[in-house]
């Protein structure tokens, strides 16, 4: 049974490995909201996961340590297990979905674990890890549905109360539910009036469904670039704890997550992975009643693949009206591009790419499509540009795929 004493013991044990991460004010991020960020993206291994993994492994007996440990993970728990096991001289094996970010896979290997890539999702990696555990007798370190792992994650709740004693609300990402279970238990045990909100990706809402339907269930699929929370089945223990200690769970879209990552980079100079940005997405897009509340967004991790980050930045720019493409039907004659460019320039936007398409079979011989890539200020400026182009006699067309 999880107790507050166990979380305090985890806090003592973790002093030797985990950082007490900063809690920073984020006044520029969400104007009108008293927002703070708990920066677990700056934690050892770049994620909160080292807390639960290290505490769990530290409590193994000598006999259990001799057997080695095995885990399943989309990446962050893997790194926590690898670091903890290596520091304690224990063999570690981690099963990871083959779609896990390359940087997380390579980091896990560098930290000393043997990695087996499994085709499919986190749940498939979990099934393979259980199979190997039964074959080898190694000790399975569950990423979330384990009392000691939850106790380790709960130390974040103690830190939040220490750093912001008058906190009113805490927003936490949810995958399997280990993080929010520990944080909610710790905070509600000491300050039961504090609101605990959970956030999931709209493409992987397993705990959100379970919470609102009051029953434990497995999704058919979990599709989101926020790989750290792409979980089809919530934990049994965590479901019970979430049902008891969490006040509300909401979901955010892929575009909203991308916009939150971009906002964190631009306004706070922080890099968050998809899962870590979900609390900020919930705050930015008004998913929760935060007015008048001192609110902490728990940035759970920052381990995002740079290739994915590049695409996320582009998506975030489009979502915020900072980047757009326009397709214009033109007469194919001198001066047309110059006229379009003058209008765009007069509106204060910047042309970053130009492409003429004369290959459409349905197009008149004397016509072409002009595709412009623009850097813009916001959605209102984009609409102004479209209006000015239309007033000048240019025909805007839907971009073809």
Predicted regions mapped to residue ranges:
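PLP-dependent amino-acid enzyme catalytic core
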Residues: 1-401
């Amino acid at each position: 049974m999880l107790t507050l004493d166990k979380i305090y013991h985890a806090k003592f044990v973790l002093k030797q490995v985990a950082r007490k991460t900063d809690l920073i004010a984020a006044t520029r991020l969400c104007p009108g909201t008293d927002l703070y960020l708990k920066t677990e993206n700056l934690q050892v291994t770049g994620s909160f996961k080292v807390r639960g993994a290290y505490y769990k492994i530290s409590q193994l007996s000598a006999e259990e340590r001799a057997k080695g440990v095995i885990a399943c993970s989309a990446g962050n728990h893997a790194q926590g297990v690898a670091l903890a096991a290596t520091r304690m001289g224990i063999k570690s094996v981690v099963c990871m979905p083959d779609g896990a970010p390359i940087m997380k896979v390579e980091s896990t290997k560098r930290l000393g674990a043997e990695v087996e890539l499994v085709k499919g999702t986190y749940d498939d990696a979990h099934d393979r890890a259980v199979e190997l555990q039964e074959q080898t007798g190694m000790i399975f370190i569950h990423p979330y549905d384990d009392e000691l792992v939850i106790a380790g994650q709960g130390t974040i709740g103690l830190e939040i109360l220490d750093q912001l004693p008058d906190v009113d609300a805490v927003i936490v990402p949810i995958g399997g539910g280990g993080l929010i279970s520990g944080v909610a238990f710790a905070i509600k045990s000491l300050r039961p009036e504090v609101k605990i909100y959970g956030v999931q990706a709209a493409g992987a809402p397993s705990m959100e469904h379970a919470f609102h339907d009051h029953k434990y269930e497995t999704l058919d699929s979990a599709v989101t670039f926020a790989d750290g929370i792409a979980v089809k089945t919530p934990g049994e223990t965590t479901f019970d704890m979430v049902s008891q200690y969490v006040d509300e769970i909401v979901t955010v879209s892929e575009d909203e997550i991308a916009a939150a990552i971009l906002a964190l980079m631009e306004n706070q100079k922080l890099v968050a992975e998809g899962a870590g940005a979900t609390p900020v997405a919930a705050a930015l897009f008004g998913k929760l009643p935060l007015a008048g509340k001192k609110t902490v967004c728990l940035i759970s991790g920052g381990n995002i693949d740079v290739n994915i980050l590049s695409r996320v930045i582009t998506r975030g720019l489009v979502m915020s009206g900072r980047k757009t493409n326009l397709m214009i039907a033109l007469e194919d004659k001198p001066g047309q591009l110059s006229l379009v460019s003058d209008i765009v320039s007069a509106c204060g936007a910047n042309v970053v790419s130009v492409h003429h398409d004369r290959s459409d079979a349905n197009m008149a011989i004397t016509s072409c499509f002009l595709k412009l890539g623009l850097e813009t200020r916001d959605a209102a400026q984009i609409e102004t540009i479209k209006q000015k182009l239309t007033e000048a006699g240019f025909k805007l067309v839907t971009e073809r795929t």
